[in-house]
Amino acid sequence: MRLWICLSMIGWTKMSNVFRIMDYLDFLIPNPKCELLYNKDYEFLIAVMLSAQTTDKRVNLVTKDLFCKYDSLDKLRKASLDDVMGFVRPLGNYMKKAKAILLISNILYDDYNGIVPNDREALEGLPMVGRKTANVVLGELFGVSAIGVDTHILRVSKRLGLVSSSNPLVVERVLDDVIPKDKWIRVHHQLVLFGRYYCKAKNPCCDCCKLKDICFK
């Protein structure tokens, strides 16, 4: 039944392209992993939230200093807004992100005994945590099969003809249908890294790409 749903959504030819794409990603990025650095679960949650509209590299620079000064959830939740804003200022939208850090820290401390919940509804109930962030957290911290559609995945999926929509939820549903569930986390990381380093928004590496014959760029 799932196969027929896949075929009805993208067709036989595109379905064969999916397996070709997965094989190429396995060749190009055999050991994919998230590039956000963290030592504790709540640090990862906050890092993913901060990564919106900026780069992982920039987030890592910010969180390294932030979590060095506030090395526990209890210390972080008691930090002043002005101090936290000073740390996250390089990321843009720093006031909202600083407020979200403090709110998330206090909610985790007060409502979840300091533990990041393994629950989508609970995660999406946190400030500035949407479906994409929840998916990334569930996959990285708990091994829950999920694909968090970010700008890289959206761009790559459209260029390779997997989707035509720019709606992240639609893209997620299509990818969920055409990619085996046990590969969701792996392919999520691969697509992010492929978009970040190869199929870039500007100056993509088309000449050396083995998928250029099916690319719609």
Residue ranges and their predicted role:
Residues G11, S16-K217:
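Catalytic cores of DNA base-excision repair glycosylases
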